[in-house]
Amino acid sequence: MLKTVLITGCSHGGLGAAMAKIYHAKGFQVFATVRNKAKVGSLGGIDGIEIMELEVTSVESIRQCANTVAKRTGGTLDILVNNAGVNAIVPLLDASLDDAKKVYDANVWSVVAMAQAFAPMLIKAKGTMCNISSVSGEMVFAWAGVYSSSRSAGTRISETLRLELAPLGVRVVTVILGGVQTSGNDPSNIADLELPSSSYYQKITAVIDLHKKTMVHPNKQNVDVAAENVVNDLLNGRGIFIRRGQASTLSWLFNTFLPYRLFTYLINRESALDKIGFRGDTE
């Protein structure tokens, strides 16, 4: 019987879609989920990859997906990859709390909901859960407070699941992903940032907008290369953390060996904080 894998967030041009193709090439039966099947791209034409609609912020949608997968596989799942997530770049003083909660629903609580729904299948298969987090969760970036804090929380959730699922025979691995060039961070696919007229940061809107769009960067890792590295690391049983993508290892080194204030200063040099009176930490 074929090994099985379910991957969330498999829209065309993203990490999930790239991983789906690699697992398929390695002989897995692949369940690739997307919010909207219209965005599935070339995955839709590959035999052996089943496209499923899934809204990871909906418990009911997750339940229906789990029931369908259980029927297809006889109640087992070898690998669950929680890859779906959303970005958010906005000053915290201007952030909509409703929108911020949606980011946490997608990047944090969806991991818990997926774990709850698919745990019986993973336990039965003595399988693996792979949770995709981000290097942003290890850094304090201006304008990324909502996103980076959600990634920090997601990493802690993943690590707690590792402890709690280990006695049940399920391996949990956290991927700390650095810069990867995907369709999702192509500037042409990202709307311009709009700050309220009352924002304290109006005069640096253009700078924050550049951070929002992340821009195409020559040093970002190709999505297909990153996907293959992550899949191979996971299948080779390489540790409880996987670091791939631009600056993922560098982040760990800087966090470990640089003074906190220096590290924070270095990564915020291009944030235009000095244009609004920023002079570093006050303590």
UniProtKB/Swiss-Prot annotation:
Positions annotated to bind NADP(+): 7, 33, 39, 55, 83, 147, 151, 180, 182
An example Gene Ontology molecular-function term: acylglycerone-phosphate reductase (NADP+) activity
Enzyme Commission number(s) of this protein: 1.1.1.-
InterPro entries: NAD(P)-bd_dom_sf (IPR036291), SDR_fam (IPR002347)
A Pfam family matched in the record: adh_short
Biological processes annotated in GO: phosphatidic acid biosynthetic process; triglyceride catabolic process
Leader peptide range in chain numbering: 1-20
Glycosylation-annotated residues: 131
UniProt keywords, alphabetically: Glycoprotein, NADP, Oxidoreductase, Signal
Family note: Belongs to the short-chain dehydrogenases/reductases (SDR) family.
Function: Short-chain dehydrogenase; part of the gene cluster that mediates the biosynthesis of the mycotoxin cyclochlorotine, a hepatotoxic and carcinogenic cyclic chlorinated pentapeptide. The function of cctT within the pathway, if any, remains undetermined. The NRPS cctN initially catalyzes the condensation of L-serine (Ser), Pro, L-2-aminobutyrate (2Abu), Ser, and beta-Phe in this order to produce isocyclotine. After the dichlorination of Pro2 catalyzed by cctP2 to produce isocyclochlorotine, the cctO-mediated transacylation of isocyclochlorotine can furnish cyclochlorotine.
Name under which the protein is recorded: Short-chain dehydrogenase cctT
Gene that this sequence comes from: cctT
